[in-house]
């Protein structure tokens, strides 16, 4: 931290868009990608805005976003910003999710399933292995919001994939925040 402050100063003074890309940004993204066992990571200004941005822009017209009914407000906001159709499935009910997909998957070019790793209000853990099976069977993308599971679940705090023993690419997108277990600010999307 002292070395970074001496080299870059103690403030970015602005967002990356205004302040410019610095080598330390990519170093952070590479470190998160290695931790989350993904190809790459992008760091954004905050966890809430990361969900809104990704959920709101990953899918478009002719696509479907299907999300857990108890998902965080930022996920709901992202679905409202997207041109894709969206619909919730009952909380942690993978049978209901599969029923929905069976009835309509062929109507959409791309389908994004969104759930949280750990739900902040009640501590429920998502049935991630079953979500992975469903996304593979129906040709969907899977995004897990790890704001409350990264640094908490798993032997070393690696999150849901470590907790459930999943391969690094079983979850297409792992969203997380830097403001909880990592004690700073920002959000990331690893995939």
What are these regions (language model features)?
Residues 3-24:
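A glycine-/small-polar-enriched, mobile loop at the entrance of the PLP active site in fold-type I
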Residues 14-21, 29-53:
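Short loop-beta-helix segment that forms the pyridoxal 5′-phosphate
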Residues 37, 61, 81-83, 138, ...:
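Short, structured coil segments at secondary-structure junctions
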Residues 54-73:
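Conserved PLP-anchoring active-site segment centered on the Schiff-base-forming lysine
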Residues 87, 91-144:
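Active-site phosphate-binding strand-loop segment of PLP-dependent enzymes
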Residues 121, 150-151:
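Catalytic P-loop NTPase motifs of RecA-like helicase/translocase cores
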Residues 162-191:
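Active-site PLP attachment segment
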């Amino acid at each position: 931290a002292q070395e970074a402050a001496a080299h870059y100063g103690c403030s970015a003074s602005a967002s990356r868009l205004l302040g410019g890309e610095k080598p330390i940004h990519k170093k952070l993204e590479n470190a998160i990608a290695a931790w989350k066992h993904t190809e790459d990571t992008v760091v954004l200004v905050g966890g809430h805005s990361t969900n809104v941005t990704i959920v709101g822009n990953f899918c478009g017209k002719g696509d479907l976003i299907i999300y857990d009914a108890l998902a965080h407000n930022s996920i709901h906001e992202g679905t409202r910003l997207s041109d894709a159709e969206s619909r919730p499935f009952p909380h942690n009910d993978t049978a209901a999710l599969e029923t929905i997909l069976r009835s309509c998957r062929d109507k959409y070019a791309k389908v994004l399933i969104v759930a949280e790793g750990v739900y902040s209000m009640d501590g429920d853990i998502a049935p991630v292995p079953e979500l992975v099976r469903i996304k593979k069977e129906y040709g969907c993308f899977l995004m897990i919001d790890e704001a409350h599971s990264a640094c908490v679940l798993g032997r070393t705090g690696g999150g849901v994939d470590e907790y459930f023993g999943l391969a690094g690419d079983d979850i297409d997108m792992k969203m997380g925040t830097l403001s909880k277990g990592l004690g700073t600010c920002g959000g990331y999307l690893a995939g």
